[in-house]
Amino acid sequence: MSFFFRYRALLVLLTVLPLSGCLFRSRKVVQPVDTVQLKTATQQELIDYINTQASKIQSAQATVDIDTTVGGVKKGKVTDYQEIRGYLLLRKPAMLRLIGLMPIVRNKAFDMVSDGQRFKLWIPSKSRFVMGRNDVETRNPSQPLESLRPQYIYDSLLLRQIDPQNEIAVMENDTELVTEVKSHKISRADYVIDVVRKGPQGWVLARKIVFSRTDLLPHRQLIYDGDGNVTTNAVYEKYKEENGVNFPWQIEIAMPQQEYDITLNIVKLELNEPLPDDKFVLEQPPGADVVDLDKREAHSQPAPATDK
């Protein structure tokens, strides 16, 4: 046999062998099957749900268990604090009070109040009284509680109505990984309502509200600042109906910029009971070490240039 014919035969053999299955193997890729019956809704139905539920709540008072975690990549460590009992008061349009109690003895661990613009924080164990505007940020690793702003909690607890004058809401179909029995993760479809708000510099993403398609209830809310950064990531679980309102009895509020995570487990809840103004008054205790964050911020600003 000539060299040419031997070469051609070898070439044909090398071409045919992979097709015969001798040089490769295949295996099945199993897609985890979601056996849960999924519900459907339109964009307008989800928007109407948000607005209707928000309009039904004017005030709330609750006994809660407070679970707190502080830290992350920025701090280089994560600290889990012992769960404590507390009391939560809310009143529209922006009033909030959160009181935490020490374990066993039930003395106050902290007392925090806000009117939506300014806040006050009393930490009895350190005789420290902090006050300032809600938008003043602090970075005090030795006092992580001072980084917590009541407004973050308020905005996460109560879904705000969508303002048709200044906001646009659109729906997207998405999926999330959920853990089923035996720790198997499956991909489950959900609905996301993106709320875009008109700002001074144009339109910005304000919120993402994620609805589970197993029950068509909001199970997550992402709130963004004007630069597109997530300020709070709230997760809602264990819904119960209270006075015609579906309200989550477990709320986890993560604040990634502050590396502060607080979970509220509701023990007792009352909605739309009268809450007078004096319920949101926090007086400065005598002899307290006062920290005015507004003055601290003013002192940290460089002095304006003057003409010589």
Region locations from a protein language model:
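Flexible, processing/modification-adjacent segments and terminal tails
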Residues: A41-Q44, I123-L205, Q284
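An acidic-aromatic
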Residues: F24, P93-D155, A288
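N-terminal leader/targeting segments and the immediate start of mature chains
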Residues: C22-E83, S147, K295-K308
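A mature extracytoplasmic/lumenal domain signature
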Residues: V64-I66, K92-A94, G100-I104, G116, ...
